[in-house]
Amino acid sequence: MICRNLQRFAAVRTLVLAALLATGLLGSTPIPLLAQASGTWTNTGSPNTARTAHTATLLGTGQVLIAGGSSSAGLLASAELYNPVTGKWTVTGSMATSRNSHTATPLPNGEVLVAGGNTAANSTATAELYNPSTGTWKTTGSMTVPRVLHGATLLPNGQVLVAGGTDATTDAELYDPSKGTWTTTGSLPNFHLVALAMLQNGRALAVDESDSSYTPGQLYDSSRRQWTPTTQMYYSHASVSTALLTNGNLLVYGNKFSCYAAEFYNPSANTWARTQRQCSNAISYGPLTLLGTGKVLLAGNAIMYGGKSFPTTNCALYDPSTNSWTLTGSLKQAAHHTLTRLLNGQVLAVGTDAELYTP
């Protein structure tokens, strides 16, 4: 099925580009192909369970925790650990609740907080803590409302900020690890599907990923427990991924276009700027991760056309110094991966298989 979809996508892309040229939307000059950069993917040990809609979290030990998600058999409560030294996976303790589309946030004490997601019955407000020392999970306080496809990020004070979700209220909430409880905080206006990211100035930035409007981002100040809008964004976004650049800017990617349509936020100036826009070898959405070189790796999950999603193995690198994208080695399999940068600088992609990227 993946091969047939990829063939269909290639044919569709040719027709799309031809149509755009014919209408003059891309101008009369040929579309520049993205340059090929170094970087390759290699297979590593296969997970015990192939999964999607899971979370991947780098632990202090250097191992990667994969939790929950969905398989061909349904929702998963299982979790496993990847050891970069051996390239092998080992099963660890299972969560109390099977879930996908949840969040996983590493805490300062080394534990990992998993919150929300879809369950067999409906969305959930439950949360659990993973202890790497014992390889076990324990339940903790539940959120004030169920959340799916929400955002979560660790604040400088050690609390976890959660916002958005498909059926959540506009209220954001805070998890206090010392008490194991949640409390509501400032309301996030008109945001439901939310991507959250921490900035170097200690504020959290929320991006609306409902693809409904060119909504300004929202900044959360933990000292005041308030949200304030940023300036207007250039694009409407969907399936958002973010990466904090070494210069302090935040790269935002994810759209329903068949082009590289990304932008970055400059906290110092409170402004948004667009990256180079190109429409060849496109990626509509996929995870981002910052490399040790200062560049950002984008691993393609899909390209959108006509309201439909087509799988892709395309990968690209964003270079902040030139504000441009270049192609890099393609994934071996289109599998809706997560991306995790390892301590050795390589990047682990996990979906229905596992691969390693060497910059």
Language-model segment annotations:
Residues 2-3, 14, 20-359:
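Kelch-like beta-propeller repeat domains
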Residues 7-15:
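N-terminal Sec-pathway targeting helices
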